Amino acid sequence: MDSAASHSVACHSTKMVALGLYFTVVVFVLFITSVNLQSPATKTEKTPKISRLYFGTLEYVNATKDQELIDGVFDAILKRLNKLDVDNPHEKNVGRYDMTTLLCWAVNNDLLYRKYGENMEVIFQLAKKFYPERDDKDKDSLGINRSLGTSKLLKWELHG
C-alpha cells in the first residue's frame, strides 16, 4: 500500500473511532437524562413531583370524537383531582391548574355536556377544595353551578 492510501485509511479509522466515542458519550448522556426523568423523586425531594394536565392533550382526545374515551379521560381527571393533597403546595398548585384546564375543556364542548351535568356537584366540591378562599357565604352549590354551567345545562336539557 502506498503512503497516500495508508494515510487515507488511518484518517478514516481515526474518524470512525472519534465518531464511536462521540456516540458513546451521547448515548450515556441520554441514558442519564432518561434515568433522571423517570426517577420519581430527586435526592432533595421527599415526594415525587406531579405533572400538570395540558390542554393540547385534551384537544387531541376531543378530536377523536370517541365518546367512551372522552368520558374516561374526564372521569380520570376528576379522580386525580380528588387524590391531590391541598396541604402540599405543589399538589395544590397542580390541582388549581388542572381544575382550570378541565373547566376550559368542558366549556362549549358538545361531547362533555352530559358528563359535566352528571358531575356538577363533584366539580363544585373540587372547586371549593382548590379555591377555598372563593367560598362566598352568599353562594350555595346550586348558584355556583349555575354560574359555571347555565348555558351548558340549558343546551344539554334542550338537546338531551
From Swiss-Prot:
Disulfide bonds: none annotated. The chain crosses the membrane at residues 17-37. GO terms for biological process: regulation of defense response to virus. GO terms for cellular component: membrane. The keyword Signal does not apply. Its main location: membrane. It is a single-pass membrane protein. It comes from the Eukaryota. Keywords: Antiviral protein, Glycoprotein, Membrane, Transmembrane, Transmembrane helix. It is found in: Membrane. The keyword Transmembrane applies. Salivary gland (at protein level). Glycans are attached at N62, N145. Induction: (Microbial infection) Up-regulated in salivary glands following infection with dengue virus type 2, Zika or chikungunya viruses (at protein level). Disruption phenotype: (Microbial infection) RNAi-mediated knockdown results in higher levels of Zika virus replication in salivary glands after infection. (Microbial infection) Modulates replication of Zika virus in salivary glands. This is Salivary gland broad-spectrum antiviral protein. It comes from Aedes aegypti (Yellowfever mosquito).
